[in-house]
Amino acid sequence: LRVFLGYVQLEGGGRVSTIPMDGGECSIRSGFGPGTPFFGDASEDLKVALQRLDFGAGGDADLSTVLEEARGRDGLTLWHLLSRTSGEQRARVYDRLASLKPPPATVTRQGVLALDATMLDRWWDDMRPF
């Protein structure tokens, strides 16, 4: 799915993906919920690793690739990965996202790692447009 105007929100399999305009994309596979959104101009390495994380046997090496390849605009992808990871992986995602798109003062690391919906929404609103 590619979005050229507005936003599209996909839900399924316990996942929610919000895909913005200006090149936002999201893979969809039968038997899974929507994949993690990304921008079409992201690196091929990031996109391949993300596909493995979403639909295959992806692991720490794939997450490391996504984190290393992420640019500021890829905050979209990293923000979605917060709710799709746990423990140390979520902490790594938070740290990389915070380095690219610092959270507002009202958003704490502890709150985000606990998936506090209010804090996640504040950060989402603060980082747009991507």
Go through the PLM ranges and name each one.
Residues T85-F130:
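Long, helix-rich interaction regions
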Residues L1-A61:
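Short, polar/charged, low-complexity connector loops/linkers at domain or secondary-structure junctions
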Residues R73-W79, A105-Q110:
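Amphipathic alpha-helical scaffolding segments comprising HEAT/armadillo-like alpha-solenoid repeats
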Residues L5-Y7, G75, W79, Y94:
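Extracytoplasmic/secreted envelope proteins and their assembly/folding machinery
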Residues D54, L67-R71, L82-S83, A98:
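Ankyrin-repeat helical core positions
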Residues D62-L67, D74, V93:
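Conserved hydrophobic register position within alpha-solenoid helical repeats
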Residues G13-V16, V66-L67, P104-R109:
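Flexible loop/turn segments at the boundaries of HEAT repeats in alpha-solenoid HEAT proteins
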